[in-house]
Amino acid sequence: MKPSGEDQAALAAGPWEECFQAAVQLALRAGQIIRKALTEEKRVSTKTSAADLVTETDHLVEDLIISELRERFPSHRFIAEEAAASGAKCVLTHSPTWIIDPIDGTCNFVHRFPTVAVSIGFAVRQELEFGVIYHCTEERLYTGRRGRGAFCNGQRLRVSGETDLSKALVLTEIGPKRDPATLKLFLSNMERLLHAKAHGVRVIGSSTLALCHLASGAADAYYQFGLHCWDLAAATVIIREAGGIVIDTSGGPLDLMACRVVAASTREMAMLIAQALQTINYGRDDEK
């Protein structure tokens, strides 16, 4: 018996098509909420440090995304930033798992600096299947699906292909720790790359959007200690599908729970940066 036309369409779309479409629609809905809230007064709290901020909109958006997905996919698991901050464990099992950052760039959001995003990643059997990132203020929808390419508003993304660090624009983020030892290491790593004649090192306040800039070819590399799995999951798929590389700062394979990453347009670039970095210890997401 041949599959029906509807069945053939579903097979062509892939086994997680419904999940992907749900992620896109929820990212767009969340973006509308964030755009409206950006200009309004906010109730701001701190989490692990004075620089680690959370607002009522973070909670509202996360609750919206999880409640909608849980209703549609009741057997799926969830890892989300604010739930983790409230004590939920970050465990990546073989079950279908949603990895969610409701507002990446909360400090930007608090200050009405318009570089903020919603990030929704999806993994099955501990392998990332797709990522959806929505730049709320510029209305740019970044998507990546394993084996099917990466796109921004329907336009295919490609990394720059740069291999020479002396011709590279490198992006990073500071991370939430502000103690003297951590700041010294952060500034030392930046100094090492500048001594290596990188064109520049930029901090934009949103790791997910920085990684999307890498995927689009607007930057050549990214590194960070202290980012979490919800910052990285969706962007990893997008970068890989745009032809880039995402690895651990040791130079080994990416460990999504290790709170550290080097991403680059080429493996040569990634290894050059990994070799230059001093490690800043942030622990692991699955041990907190």
UniProtKB/Swiss-Prot annotation:
The cross-references to SUPFAM superfamilies, in alphabetical order and at most eight, read: Carbohydrate phosphatase
Induction (UniProt):
Repressed by Li(+).
GO CC term, one of those recorded:
cytoplasm
Q: EC number(s) per UniProt? A: 3.1.3.25
User: So where does substrate get bound?
Assistant: 81, 103-106, 205-207, 224, 231
The residues that the entry says bind Mg(2+) 2 are: 101, 104, 231
UniProt-annotated location(s): Cytoplasm
Which InterPro entries does the UniProt record give? IMPase (IPR033942), Inositol_monoP_metal-BS (IPR020583), Inositol_monoPase_Li-sen (IPR020552), Inositol_monophosphatase-like (IPR000760), Inositol_monophosphatase_CS (IPR020550)
What one GO molecular function would you report for this record?
glycerol-2-phosphatase activity
Gene3D superfamilies noted in UniProt: 3.40.190.80, Fructose-1,6-Bisphosphatase, subunit A, domain 1 (3.30.540.10)
Q: Which cofactor does it need?
A: Mg(2+)
* Domain of life where this protein originates: Eukaryota
Write down the top EC class of this protein. hydrolase
Effect of mutating residue 104 to N: Loss of activity
**What does the free-text pH dependence field read?**
Optimum pH is 7.5-8.0.
**Catalytic reaction list:** a myo-inositol phosphate + H2O = myo-inositol + phosphate; 1D-myo-inositol 1-phosphate + H2O = myo-inositol + phosphate; 1D-myo-inositol 2-phosphate + H2O = myo-inositol + phosphate; 1D-myo-inositol 3-phosphate + H2O = myo-inositol + phosphate
| Family that this chain belongs to | Belongs to the inositol monophosphatase superfamily.
Q: What is the annotated role of this protein in its UniProt record?
A: Phosphatase that can use myo-inositol monophosphates, myo-inositol 1,4-diphosphate, scyllo-inositol-1,4-diphosphate, glucose-1-phosphate, beta-glycerophosphate and 2'-AMP as substrates in vitro. It is likely that IMPA2 has an as yet unidentified in vivo substrate(s). Has been implicated as the pharmacological target for lithium (Li(+)) action in brain.
Summarize the subunit comment.
Homodimer.
| Protein name per the record | Inositol monophosphatase 2
User: Which gene is this protein's source?
Assistant: IMPA2
